[in-house]
Amino acid sequence: MAKAKFERTKPHVNIGTIGHVDHGKTSLTAAITMVLAKTGGAQATAYDQIDAAPEEKERGITISTAHVEYETKNRHYAHVDCPGHADYVKNMITGAAQMDGAILVVSAADGPMPQTREHILLAKQVGVPAMVVFLNKVDMVDDSDLLELVEMEVRELLSKYGFPGDEIPIIKGSALQALEGKPEGEKAINELMDAVDSYIPQPVRATDKPFLMPIEDVFSISGRSTVVTGRVESGIIKVGEEIEIVGLKDTQKTTCTGVEMFRKLLDEGQAGDNVGILLRGTKREEVERGQVLAKPGSIKPHDKFEAEVYVLSKEEGGRHTPFTNDYRPQFYFRTTDVTGTIKLPADKQMVMPGDNATFTVELIKPIAMQEGLKFSIREGGRTVGAGVVTKINN
């Protein structure tokens, strides 16, 4: 049977459920698909189908993630749900499932728990722009004062980690009642989706961002200057535009004199295209893999940054022993490895395999970077960790 063509008539948003174990993330995901299926906006997906999430590999790390899709009146959503806490940590740090927004699920019967905090913090660290809260299991709470108290606690927690706790929509409901087809259960799910539609901002499309292309390869064509190849990460490059070569060395200015794709000449290359770009007056030895081509002034090279990192466990093929301050692995950014030194916070003696941690890194050469950039940590060619730049230190 031929695959159904994906009709993209509505704007697309990537979203995910986050929150403490057993607070009802997977039940809520199932409930959303069941309620929206009634208006033809989704295919109803049962709890156990979502819970049996397939394993995927992202940058050498195995993560279990379930994906469902659905649509509301205004948007098309791809929704990700992870079965285990470790899967969330890995998912958010590696960016395996990009999230433009999140639904934080908190059980009204328990209130915020340790993983509630950790997921909010992670969402902040990795740059999830907005979230909406679903206060689940309200059918188990008879006392309205208690509900109010839990809502206050959630708002305080969100504010503590830098989200606008006073403004974030909090929807009260019961995923279980929605799954059972009870009207009050379904009403809450519809309210939740209205809040997600209106409160989570439309993401900026990759083509609308400044031009950036990580350089994968460099060739010289006799008599026709230098060609660099790579996949355009964001923005658009047009023939005749001035661009910068950033990272590893001093930033250089050059001009794009041609864009080639599959041996054909184009007027422009855009986000997602694998292209060759001809550079005017740039010598073969002045450019190398690991640098980026970028719109002038849009990105700067840096060698010191703070990062949120997940360290692979021994079972995942990571280190067998913890690492301590001044550990010097390779940091793999986009297309290249750069050696760097890790500085742990004063209160941390070591980082164990299987942990996630925050620390500072000092690279031996600067890399074109901005907050939110993902990287791998490698040692002798194998991946031992994955991280995201949370703050640049100059």
UniProtKB/Swiss-Prot annotation:
Q: Which residues bind GTP?
A: 19-26, 81-85, 136-139
Per its UniProt entry, which superkingdom is the organism in?
Answer: Bacteria
Instruction: Provide this UniProt record's keywords sorted from A to Z.
Output: Cytoplasm, Elongation factor, GTP-binding, Hydrolase, Magnesium, Metal-binding, Nucleotide-binding, Protein biosynthesis
Group of enzyme by EC:
hydrolase
Q: Where is this region: G1?
A: 19-26
| Catalyses which reaction(s) | GTP + H2O = GDP + phosphate + H(+)
Function of the molecule: GTP hydrolase that promotes the GTP-dependent binding of aminoacyl-tRNA to the A-site of ribosomes during protein biosynthesis.
Record's protein name: Elongation factor Tu
